Swiss-Prot record:
Keywords: DNA damage, DNA recombination, DNA repair. The keyword Signal does not apply. It comes from Wolbachia pipientis wMel. Gene3D superfamilies: Nucleic acid-binding proteins, Recombination protein O, C-terminal domain. This is DNA repair protein RecO.
Length: 240
């Protein structure tokens, strides 16, 4: 059993003195793991977010298998001095490692992650919007798309200021004001991202409001269902 693909490193764990278990998010094979040998330049080659050419081989598809890797690009040095960006990319990698099913392609999510890495690498000011879009897309790809297009009660598309924590659907101000303490806020930034307006810049506080909402649904639909702890790094993004 053998395949070749490109992939982004989302986790790396030492296995003995001379080996590493790599977890890759690949373009055509989804999340895959494999054993690879440590080399003199391993610290540089096997950083989170690095893009690799990978050749995987094993006797059976369900085996861990072996990975031969060739570095295509190492973007981490572009943003490692920016604490928020570094935490963001490592946090999202951890999320993918924990919730993505094995061997199921998610090509759209993969392409968007590659694009997001380019966005932060080139210091695009709208990178936070692109990140929220990634988390929304992850929910969608795994079958939990939020419906933020109209009010769940009345169907109106204006003045959407809340989100139901039970259904993941938008609620208008007129309806939601009566039980606002039981609803999540619907930040303007998240509204724009949902409607594919990713170019605006917002305050960090607005970004954190968006993170609280997407984080709530990531935890509810994915982590709690898998009985897996929500990543501490993701929580750290709310306290910076």
């Amino acid at each position: 059993m053998r395949w070749k693909d490109e992939g982004i490193i989302i986790a790396a764990k030492k296995y003995g003195d001379k080996n590493l278990i790599l977890s890759l998010f690949t373009k055509n094979h989804g999340k895959r793991r494999g054993l690879t040998k440590l080399t003199n330049n391993s610290n540089y080659k096997f950083q989170i977010s690095n893009l690799l050419h990978a050749e995987w081989s094993a006797k059976l598809p369900e085996n861990l298998g072996f990975l031969k890797c060739e570095l295509i690009e190492s973007p981490f040095h572009h943003f490692f001095q920016d604490r928020l960006k570094s935490i963001t990319i490592v946090s999202f990698s951890s999320i993918l490692e924990k919730v993505l099913p094995e061997s199921e392609p998610c090509a759209m999510l993969y392409d968007n992650l590659r694009y997001f890495i380019d966005v932060i690498k080139h210091n695009n000011q709208s990178w936070q919007s692109h990140y929220l879009n990634l988390e929304l897309l992850l929910l969608t790809q795994l079958g939990f798309k939020l419906d933020l297009s109209k009010c769940a009660v009345t169907g109106v598309k204006e003045n959407l200021q809340f989100i139901s924590p039970k259904t993941g659907r938008a609620v208008s101000k007129k309806v939601g004001d009566y039980y606002a303490d039981k609803l999540l806020p619907f930040p303007q930034m998240l509204h724009d991202v949902y409607n594919n307006n990713l170019q605006n810049s917002y305050s960090f506080q607005e970004f954190q409001l968006g993170l609280k909402v997407t984080g709530y649904f990531l935890n509810k639909y994915l982590f709690l269902q898998l009985n897996v702890k929500f990543p501490e790094l993701r929580n750290l993004m709310l306290s910076l």
